[in-house]
């Protein structure tokens, strides 16, 4: 888990600075609304990084990734990506997702054990291809 968390923090920091990302959600980022609580309860931020991509590009972005596999569930040593609005939160419906602040542009990453620089390079290449 240490390597998952280390990689996830680096990916979250990268995404939080990217101009094509509207919002990055990761409990170890200082701007996370529950950062202080997470710091007290957790030694690390976990392996899941969520972000909202600018524009209507979630599927285009996901389809251009090479290292990440598209999946509707997480729990692997390999990096995975999912689209919450059409997988985990599909049954809630559009209005329910709006109330829960789960936009269609939201993407969730499960960060694996691959080299973190390779993961960031894959993400960056996907951004460059679609936007």
Label each residue range with its predicted role.
Residues 45-47, 75-77, 103-105:
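A generic structural signal for well-ordered coil/turn residues at beta-strand boundaries
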Residues 65-75, 126-131:
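A common structural junction motif
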């Amino acid at each position: 888990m240490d390597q998952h968390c280390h990689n996830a923090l680096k990916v979250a920091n990268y995404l939080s600075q990217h101009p094509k990302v509207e919002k990055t959600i990761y409990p170890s980022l200082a701007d996370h609304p529950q950062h202080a609580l997470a710091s007290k309860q957790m030694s690390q931020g976990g392996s899941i990084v969520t972000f909202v991509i600018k524009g209507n590009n979630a599927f285009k972005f996901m389809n251009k990734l090479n290292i990440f596999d598209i999946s509707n569930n997480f729990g692997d040593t390999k990096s995975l990506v999912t689209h919450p609005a059409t997988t985990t939160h599909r049954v809630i419906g559009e209005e329910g997702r709006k109330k829960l602040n789960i936009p269609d542009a939201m993407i969730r990453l499960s960060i694996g054990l691959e080299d973190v620089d390779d993961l960031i390079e894959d993400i960056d290449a996907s951004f460059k291809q679609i936007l």
